[in-house]
């Protein structure tokens, strides 16, 4: 009887670990977000128009991986030049708010103060397909005249 209970417990633990591992792989990591931002910087420096087109192409796996994506905006007017949500294109990043949190202004100010160094912005933002904000961090930097970032859920 104890052996049967032990086998059942092991099976349940294996199943639980499999679910936890699968869920962890659905979200990008901090290291992956930072690497994607570095790849985006290289692409922007090589050819800005081609890079922005790639950032806006949801099928481009270099710049769209699970819940990781590149976003950019023009540093002179704050208008989004790259974002997976087409409704945000051309709008001012500084106007972006989640609940009453002035998220866009935080991102803009962090890029402006960090310059070409990589800065971080902590905030709450809904995961894709949800409405409840959860902790997220974005790595942000200035590349030419573009403020760009890649965020990951903590």
What are these regions (language model features)?
Residues 2-154:
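N-terminal membrane-sensor/transducer module of prokaryotic signaling receptors
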């Amino acid at each position: 009887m104890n052996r049967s209970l032990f086998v059942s417990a092991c099976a349940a633990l294996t199943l639980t670990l499999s679910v936890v591992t699968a869920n962890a792989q659905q979200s990008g990591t901090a290291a992956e977000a930072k690497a994607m931002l570095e790849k985006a910087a290289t692409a922007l420096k090589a050819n800005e128009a081609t890079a922005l087109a790639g950032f806006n192409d949801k099928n481009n796996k270099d710049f769209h991986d699970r819940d990781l994506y590149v976003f950019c905006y023009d540093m002179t007017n704050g208008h989004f030049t790259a974002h997976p949500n087409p409704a945000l294109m051309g709008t001012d990043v500084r106007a972006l708010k989640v609940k009453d949190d002035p998220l866009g202004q935080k991102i803009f100010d962090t890029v402006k103060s960090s310059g070409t160094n990589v800065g971080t912005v902590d905030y709450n933002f809904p995961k894709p397909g949800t409405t409840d904000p959860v902790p997220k961090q974005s790595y942000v930097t200035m590349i030419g005249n573009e403020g760009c970032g890649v965020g990951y859920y903590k």
